[in-house]
Amino acid sequence: PVPAVASDTTHRNEHGGERQTFVIDVDGVVASLVPDNDYAMAEPLEGTIAAINRLHAAGHRIIMFTARGSATGIDWSTVTRDQFARWGLHYHELHFGKPAGDYYVDDRLISIAALQALA
């Protein structure tokens, strides 16, 4: 079962189940980490993309959230959208502006392995 989330993010999906919202990072999750943050060189992480696509197909809401460009001011939006299209990633929203950090601490964290097990 998908872990419980706050009621303001849980809705019914078209399959009759609860639609949950997954907010998913980009680099290191669906895109490979690359030297010097040259994101145009990133490769797809196909196992995670397949898991996300299964969640999307099951009616869950997928929001991609990235720190691409947050530290440098470079606009990576076209590169990122083109990559997602080329890689076949299914999502509902893409958000930039995640603060660049060394670590993120979150009370709703699930690992990539747990995400893949859910899908």
Give the residues covered by each predicted segment.
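HAD-like aspartate-dependent phosphatase fold
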Residues: 1-119
